[in-house]
Amino acid sequence: MSILPILQIGDVLVSSDIFTEKFCCDLEKCKGVCCVEGDAGAPVTLDEVGEIENALDIVWSDLSASAQSVIDKQGVAYTDQEGDLVTSIVHGKNCVFTCYTSQESTSETDGGLPPGCCICALEKAFRAGKSKWRKPMSCALYPIRVKVFGGGLVGLNYNRWAICKDAVLKGEQLNIPVYKFLKGPLIQRFGEAWYTELCEVAEQFGY
């Protein structure tokens, strides 16, 4: 049975790419470069901006001086050229919450992340038990991007980015489709019942 380009599951329009494409982050190779590259910050909601502001004192010392300066001047988020609310950035690309593991990083010191790896300061605080909020949902769901339509309808699209080529290769080697790689974030965003239905649709089409 051939799969349709777009499927509707509940109030969510799902691109079939999340079933057919493989993906698994390979931080040993990419070092978390997705937090650095790009011409805009990560998409955020107003509620998420509030969560970030609440965590700011906790993560402040992990931020670069340049990032602190940007936040002092314009806050933790801004509206980009497309009209989307996104996290503030430094030098036209780095998210202000970018920080790095040490060159002597170990599983005990940096949660198993490789040395010199970029990590979100918000997630670092969460992993250390200093904050109850992890990071923006748009970051957790990457490489899926969420598009909000009217009437409560949202769309999920697979975003292809050249810097994630190692994640695609690892996903292919391990045979992990995008929707399985992002099981946790998808459940967090849409719920267990919705994800179960998503898996049933995938199985129906042989994925």
Regions found by a protein language model. Name each.
Residues M1-Y207:
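Short loop/turn segments that flank or connect secondary-structure elements
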